[in-house]
Amino acid sequence: MAQASADVLIPLLWERLSPEHWPVRLTQLPEGTALVGGAIRDALLNQLSDQPDLDFIVPSNAIALAKSLSKQLGGTAVVLDAERDIARLVLNNWTIDLARQDGQTIEQDLLRRDYGVNAIALGLRPWGELWDPTGGLSDLRDGRLRAVSEGNLVDDPLRLLRGPRLISEHPLELEAKTQQWIALHRKRLGQAAPERILSELQRLVRGPQADAAIACLKTLDLLHGWAAGEP
């Protein structure tokens, strides 16, 4: 991805994301809604699927919004995290996650995410603002996978495994400092739920760069402690 300004990237994202084909209309979302995460990353890499998973940040009441949309549109709403106000809406084979903004601003929310390439947001209501407080656009351009911070990896140990999984799916290489952090905290992976670990591994082995990702797992010795049942 060549270096480009927001004036170029925003129309490009809009064209590739094609929100007019989403099962939820933008007018059904509250003011302050932004799209974040994998759909943004994949659109910028031109690897977007026909029905990408959509992750929306909303100012408040995400669970209530998911339930309301499910009643209006005939989908199914599932509460993922009541304390953090996160829900999932499954609708016409689309998966839409809605989460209350974590922090006072969208920038603060993005600074708490796992990797820079996942910490990019596009404003939907109002439309037209692109947030990239961690340098994720540069990471995508340079083919680099970089953790936002060491603390963010430890906050949810599954993020340690998510790095190699992202390598399996995208043309990215782990940045050196991020490799050090993952290796340092590798035994913490056992704190994640086994079903979440299994889901990441299943996606990893199906990725087009699975060989590179498996080599990364071996280099980092990431699964040894988990597979051996070490604390």
Each model region followed by its residue ranges:
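Catalytic cores of the polymerase beta-like nucleotidyltransferase superfamily
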Residues: 1-231
